[in-house]
Amino acid sequence: YKSTFRLPTFNDLYYYRLGNRNLRPEKADEYNVGITWSKSGLSVFDYISVTLDGYYNDVTDKIVAFPTTYAWKMANYGKVHAAGVDATLAATVPLTEKIRLIMSGGYTWQKAIDLTDSDAKNYKDQLPYTPLHSGNASAIVETPWVNVGYSAVGVGKRYYLSQNIPENEIEGYLEHTMSLSHEFALGGCRLLLQAEIINLTDEQYDVIKYYPMPGRSWRLTGTFKF
């Protein structure tokens, strides 16, 4: 358990169009319980780790960026209850003497509801841009020649305004990324080259309403390590 207190930042108060000089400090009572299990040297796994956390937050005057018709604005939600569960899994599997598979994944369930005004139409509705379900997964095959990676990020439906009605709904999405990488020795330093295909399936989605994210794209990066 912990009790927290957060003052509005300078940008929260004064940023052009977004800021709100009337913001009140945010206060919260936070409760959390979690377990972690890990093991090395198993017959299948070199290493495996599992975590599970549950939490409940009772928040007064929660500071949020609130979407309006033409611009975003910082505002206080008078009373918010947030409950959630976070789960993660990480594992390393040796495939051969020189090749291994590294896997990881995470899932979040979060219910964050507005309890400010019991007479309001959005009473007990999920906060804007807060998905109930979200998760990620990744896998990398490491070899002496090249590393092959895959990752996916998924987000469930959200609402871009306070009322949880179909007109305000933003569809969920699942984005995939593939990568190839290899590290070279160059004298006293090392060069890591990586090629990626981002949004492999060319998924059309919005993170923010009316601002579509890019489709399929390619990226090549190089990193020197001295």
Question: Residue ranges of each PLM-predicted region?
Answer:
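Surface-exposed extracellular loop regions of Gram-negative outer-membrane beta-barrel proteins
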Residues: 1-32, 47-50, 54-77, 153-163, ...
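Residue-level signature of outer-membrane beta-barrel architecture
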Residues: 3, 25, 37-39, 79, ...
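Residues that define the transmembrane beta-barrel architecture of outer-membrane proteins
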Residues: 27-31, 79-85, 129-135, 172-176, ...
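Outer-membrane beta-barrel "beta-signal"
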Residues: 32-36, 88, 214-226
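Short, glycine/charged-rich beta-strand-loop motifs at protein surfaces that mediate ligand recognition
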Residues: 41, 53, 163-170, 177-181
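Gram-negative outer-membrane beta-barrel transporters
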Residues: 43-58, 75-161, 192, 201
